[in-house]
């Protein structure tokens, strides 16, 4: 017995393109690739396809067409006594021919729904390749996972940029309950983050409002601030604990950081001390590291001036 509801969709003449299997698959792949319920697209008019399985692999959902018996295979071989005998090479097997099992076209458990501890580096890289069709490995990524005061999950990737040939523009895909909404919605995602690639899923995001309303929504502003803070924290943490890696990535991430400092005051306040500059020895230094020797020289000069002044006063006292 079939379980569930059958919905028959009647299409107007100007919408008949959606009756085409490939067009329907295209739409489903775009908007429902990560929908939490499995989706199967089956063309009922196509010729049926079959596959064979072992009896123990059969499930209640399988439609068995026939049972296939394969007789045991034997060969004539010589035994230890040099006598020829018939030896069984492979035993008699039983297989089931069934209608080919449909494969879901979506992944109901995308990487961003999992805890970061459950994800390996290869998982992140594979997800990046599959979603963005970019086969250059990302430099690093940030896994967003927040439950309070709002529900937000996602992954932001820092792509490797070849500025001579590549566009610096990225892609941030916005989802609501794992259903795709749109790319690069600037009312929700800070403009400078558009240089990155990633996915953000926020079930609490209001969808039935205009873009102007989104822009003035305090809740949306909090989402934007949270994402900005997490990105800054990741970069600062890397600079403090993995300075060599931070320096190695600098040519790729500096356009993003500098643009972010121009566009977002809070991001700028956090990142000011972590922007790198090269000195004449081709060594990377932060602004505080550059100013530190200057401050020491200033303090030394001030101390020397004080000492000279004290010596001058002593000499004056001697001649009085």
Regions found by a protein language model. Give the residues of each.
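Conserved GHKL (Bergerat-fold) ATPase module
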Residues: 1-320
């Amino acid at each position: 017995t079939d379980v569930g509801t059958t919905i028959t969709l009647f299409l107007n003449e100007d919408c008949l393109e959606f009756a085409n299997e490939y067009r329907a698959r295209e739409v489903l792949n775009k908007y429902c690739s990560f929908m939490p319920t499995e989706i199967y697209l089956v063309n009922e008019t196509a010729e049926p396809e079959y596959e064979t399985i072992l009896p123990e692999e059969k499930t209640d959902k399988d439609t068995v067409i026939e049972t296939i018996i394969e007789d045991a295979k034997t060969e004539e071989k010589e035994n230890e006594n040099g006598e020829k005998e018939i030896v069984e090479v492979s035993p008699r097997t039983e297989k089931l021919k069934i209608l080919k099992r449909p494969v879901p076209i979506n992944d109901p458990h995308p990487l961003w729904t999992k805890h970061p501890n459950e994800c390996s580096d290869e998982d992140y890289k594979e997800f990046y390749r599959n979603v963005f069709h970019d086969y250059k490995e990302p430099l690093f990524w940030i896994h967003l996972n927040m439950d309070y005061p709002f529900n937000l999950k996602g992954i932001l990737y820092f792509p490797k940029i070849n500025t001579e040939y590549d566009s610096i523009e990225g892609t941030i895909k916005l989802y609501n309950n794992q259903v795709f909404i749109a790319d690069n919605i600037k009312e929700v995602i800070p403009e400078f983050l558009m240089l990155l690639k990633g996915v953000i899923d926020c079930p609490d995001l209001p969808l039935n409002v205009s873009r102007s309303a989104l822009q003035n929504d305090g809740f949306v502003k909090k989402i934007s601030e949270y994402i900005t803070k997490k990105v800054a924290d990741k970069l600062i943490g890397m600079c403090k604990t993995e300075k060599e890696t931070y320096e190695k990535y600098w040519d790729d991430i500096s356009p993003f950081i500098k643009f972010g400092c121009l566009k977002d005051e809070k991001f700028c306040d956090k990142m000011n001390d972590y922007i790198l500059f090269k000195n004449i020895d081709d060594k990377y230094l932060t602004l505080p590291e550059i100013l530190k020797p200057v401050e020491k020289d200033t303090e030394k000069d001030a101390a020397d001036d004080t000492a000279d002044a004290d010596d001058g006063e002593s000499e004056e006292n001697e001649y009085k």
